[in-house]
Swiss-Prot record:
Name of the protein: 4-hydroxy-3-methylbut-2-enyl diphosphate reductase
Source organism per UniProt: Prochlorococcus marinus subsp. pastoris (strain CCMP1986 / NIES-2087 / MED4)
Entry keyword set: 4Fe-4S, Iron, Iron-sulfur, Isoprene biosynthesis, Metal-binding, Oxidoreductase
Known EC number: 1.17.7.4
Reaction(s) this enzyme catalyzes, per UniProt: isopentenyl diphosphate + 2 oxidized [2Fe-2S]-[ferredoxin] + H2O = (2E)-4-hydroxy-3-methylbut-2-enyl diphosphate + 2 reduced [2Fe-2S]-[ferredoxin] + 2 H(+); dimethylallyl diphosphate + 2 oxidized [2Fe-2S]-[ferredoxin] + H2O = (2E)-4-hydroxy-3-methylbut-2-enyl diphosphate + 2 reduced [2Fe-2S]-[ferredoxin] + 2 H(+)
PANTHER family hit by this protein: 4-HYDROXY-3-METHYLBUT-2-ENYL DIPHOSPHATE REDUCTASE, CHLOROPLASTIC
GTP-binding in keyword set: no
Underlying gene: ispH
Cofactor descriptive note: Binds 1 [4Fe-4S] cluster per subunit.
Name of the top EC class for this enzyme: oxidoreductase
Pathway(s) this gene product operates in, as recorded in its UniProt entry: Isoprenoid biosynthesis; dimethylallyl diphosphate biosynthesis; dimethylallyl diphosphate from (2E)-4-hydroxy-3-methylbutenyl diphosphate: step 1/1; Isoprenoid biosynthesis; isopentenyl diphosphate biosynthesis via DXP pathway; isopentenyl diphosphate from 1-deoxy-D-xylulose 5-phosphate: step 6/6
GO MF annotation terms: 4 iron, 4 sulfur cluster binding; 4-hydroxy-3-methylbut-2-enyl diphosphate reductase activity; metal ion binding
Residues reported in the UniProt entry to bind isopentenyl diphosphate: 96, 185, 317-319, 380
Keyword Metal-binding set for record: yes
Length: 398
């Protein structure tokens, strides 16, 4: 399928909208009313610090809603106002934030159901309005919705679209796309649908494994079993890893994406020599600015003398879990929560989710005496949620 030609055709359809309905000023005002916090604004204006009694708060200097998320959420709300009586569907969570998605449900936006990873579009009819979330949608989903005669509201983050352009470039020049991401993540599913041959690698360990295979040090059956579900149909590692380009899920750890790019550049340099490198490796630049800023701010935050650190964001939010990884790697006692309700003021407890683990209840999580708490949040977390967490910490330390 010529995905570029399809996208061009879709963009010229009178049933496709990727700009929204409100002016930038009205959009900003609506978001400010819904999600901004005077407390957070005050803390930002005070060098990201706050003190109340024995509680000392240090906020990361970049956290919370990014531009792409703000745009997607605003467009989703605008869509209901613009189509007050129509059936409105969304193909997935608009962003990985439970409060925002719950608000859409209260606005009678229906979420496409899925079973075993297969979405059921049977209830979507001609003339219905369908929102594509910030992560994007697969090209097959877009084609299906277009053929059904739906009004498509595309809130895909422009940084995600940039990655799609990258893998389409790989396809045009017959390169296999190596995508740094989680193969079941909505964004990676969308990105891979625009590729021809692709392989998804989760981390540096998997990238090094692929590198060894390219250099002739691996077993094909083991390779195929290890990456089952993470490569394109008909993928043959003996043929499809001679020419590779790297792309990424925009919310992955920036430093690891860069390392993975270096791994494959060095691998192709070793196998084919400098004179043929450009024929076998395509450089990339698909790291999202907002992801980079939040991770850099987190690296600065963990250098502070913190007693504990609270990371706020959806449990299925990739960018949030990577922020937590940074804290863990610095051996800081950190707690990942998705909503302020995970904190009990009465019990001085926090119900949190450690990495790759089930929920854990930590009692007496705020110790006696002076305490310095670091706080950050993922790109899908509104300021009001962060403020509500801080208010609970204030109440505990009174």
């Amino acid at each position: 399928m010529d995905t570029q030609a399809f996208r061009r055709s879709l963009h010229h359809s009178d049933r496709y909208n990727r700009r929204g309905f409100d002016s930038p000023t009205k959009r900003a005002q609506a978001l400010e009313e819904a999600y901004q916090s005077d407390l957070i604004t005050s803390i930002r204006n005070n060098s990201f610090t706050y003190k109340k009694g024995r509680l000392n708060i240090k906020l990361a200097q970049a956290f919370g809603f990014c531009w792409g998320v703000e745009r997607a959420v605003a467009m989703a709300y605008e869509t209901r106002r613009h189509y007050p009586d129509e059936n409105i569907w969304i193909t997935n969570e608009i962003i990985h934030n439970p409060s925002v998605n719950d608000h859409l449900r209260k606005m009678n936006v229906k979420f496409i159901s899925a079973k075993n990873g297969i979405k059921d579009f049977s209830l979507v009819s001609d003339g219905d309005v369908v929102i594509l979330p910030a992560f994007g949608a697969t090209v097959q989903e877009m084609k299906l919705l277009h053929e059904k005669g739906c009004h498509i509201i595309d809130t895909t983050c422009p940084w995600v679209s940039k990655v799609w352009h990258t893998v389409e470039k790989h396809k045009k020049h017959t390169f296999t796309s190596i995508i740094h991401g989680k193969f079941k993540h909505e964004e990676t599913l969308a990105t891979s649908s625009f590729a021809d041959k692709y392989l998804v690698v989760l981390n540096l360990e998997e990238a090094n494994y692929v590198s060894e295979y390219i250099l002739g040090r691996g077993n094909k059956n083991h390779f195929l079993n290890k990456f089952a579900q993470a490569f394109s149909n008909g993928f043959d590692p003996d043929k499809d890893l001679d020419r590779v380009g790297v792309a990424n899920q925009t919310t992955m750890l920036k430093s690891e994406t860069e390392e993975i790019g270096k791994v494959f550049e060095k691998t192709m340099l070793h196998k084919f020599g400098p004179e043929k490198l450009n024929s076998h490796f395509l450089a990339f630049n698909t790291i999202c600015d907002a992801t980079e800023e939040r991770q850099d701010a987190m690296f600065s935050l963990v250098d502070e003398d913190l007693d504990i650190l609270v990371v706020i964001g959806g449990y299925n939010s990739s960018n949030t879990t990577h922020l937590q990884e940074i804290a863990i790697n610095k051996n800081i006692s950190s707690f990942h929560i998705d909503t302020p309700e995970r904190i009990s003021v009465k019990e001085n407890s926090i119900l949190h989710k450690p990495l790759k683990s089930e929920m854990v209840l930590k009692k007496n999580f705020i110790p006696d005496g002076e305490i310095k708490v670091g706080i950050t949040s993922g790109a899908s977390t509104p300021d009001k949620i962060v403020a509500d967490v801080i208010e609970k910490l204030i109440a505990i330390t009174k």
